């Protein structure tokens, strides 16, 4: 979302400073010092530090049960977002995704000006008539009942419709014309490790995605289904013992859009192991929840060899996780090309 907003503002001549979570494909970096008056920054709620920011415009895309090791409960996480949404000045704007129930729940306690976006007819900025066309997505934008026009983005998935709607809402608040917004979104070429196509070899396409939360995984797999009519093989490396424990039940239901799931050991990310929190338990649970083709490979160094026994011409392999699972995708491409 942040990178789309920054791209649209840059296209509109605002030359913003940008600090984004992932590297923009167009820049090869995740930060750029601009000469304009705006800074577009990706806020991090994981440790509560986002409450140290003083935004003029804030965008809240979703609130999922994440980082509960820091907050202790969902109620405390929601309270932090209530504070964040109301930190804007009187002339500012909070932009909220109306379709996300936890974000929607902020509205009764909003003390400052806000705008909404989503598929809901009640959203200020609404997407209608969504069409998926390979790696492109088209939809019509409605603003408070008035048709603004058609948008095309060069990436699949409903989550990217939401991301672009957020960018449209921000740019509209800054009085940017719809045609300029449309051109800016059409020029957006994506972010590294966000549905990044790594290459194709032997008729097998490899995509890498940073998604490590169940909702992110579902969104990525759904986007793959929208973009290609192929067998989908998801290669997932769980990230953090605490996240695996806290969202265990949600992970079990996150992979139904994949034909085959390959799991490897948990990427600790500096955490100490938690007793009885194991990737093997995820493997067993996903099978018990009805998935027909699940594999567990504890040693990630052996993933590529196992994948070579699984993949067929025409398959789509997606590496998923915030750790180093992307290396398995790159090695698979090398092996398929005969380089290793």
Predicted stretch roles:
Residues 76, 84-92, 112, 219-228, ...:
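P-loop/Walker A phosphate-binding loop and immediately adjacent motor/lid segment at beta-alpha junctions
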Residues 252-313:
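C-terminal helical cap/extension that packs against the catalytic core
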Residues 57, 135, 143-260, 284:
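Nucleotide phosphate-binding/pyrophosphate-handling subdomain across enzymes
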Residues 302-333:
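A glycine-rich beta-strand to alpha-helix segment
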């Amino acid at each position: 979302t942040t990178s789309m907003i920054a791209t649209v503002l840059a296209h509109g001549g605002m030359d913003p400073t940008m600090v984004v979570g992932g590297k923009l494909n167009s820049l090869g970096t995740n930060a750029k010092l601009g000469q304009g008056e705006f800074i577009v920054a990706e806020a991090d709620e994981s440790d509560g530090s986002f409450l140290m920011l003083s935004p003029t415009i804030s965008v809240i895309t979703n609130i999922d049960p994440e980082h509960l090791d820091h907050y202790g409960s969902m109620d405390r996480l929601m309270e932090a977002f209530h504070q964040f949404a109301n930190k804007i000045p009187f002339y500012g704007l909070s932009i909220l995704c109306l379709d996300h129930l936890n974000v929607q729940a902020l509205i009764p306690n909003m003390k400052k000006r806000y705008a909404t976006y989503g598929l809901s007819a009640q959203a200020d900025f609404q997407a209608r008539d969504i069409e998926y066309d390979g790696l492109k997505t088209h939809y019509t934008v409605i603003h408070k009942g008035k048709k603004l026009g058609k948008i095309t983005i060069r990436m699949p998935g409903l989550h990217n419709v939401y991301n672009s709607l957020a960018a449209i809402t921000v740019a509209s608040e800054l009085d940017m014309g719809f045609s300029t917004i449309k051109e800016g979104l059409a020029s957006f070429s994506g972010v590294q490790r966000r549905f990044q196509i790594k290459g194709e070899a032997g008729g097998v396409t490899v995509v890498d995605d940073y998604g490590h939360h169940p909702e992110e995984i579902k969104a990525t797999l759904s986007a793959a289904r929208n973009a290609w009519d192929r067998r989908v093989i998801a290669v997932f490396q769980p990230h953090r013992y605490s996240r695996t424990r806290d969202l265990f039940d949600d992970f079990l239901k996150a992979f139904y859009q994949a034909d085959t799931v390959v799991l490897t050991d948990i990427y600790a990310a500096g955490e100490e192991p938690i007793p009885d929190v194991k990737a093997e338990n995820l493997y067993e649970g996903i099978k018990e929840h009805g998935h027909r083709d699940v594999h567990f490979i504890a040693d990630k160094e052996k993933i590529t060899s196992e994948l070579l026994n699984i993949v067929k011409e025409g398959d789509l392999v997606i590496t998923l996780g915030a750790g180093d699972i992307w290396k398995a995708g790159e090695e698979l491409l090398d092996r398929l090309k005969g380089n290793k």
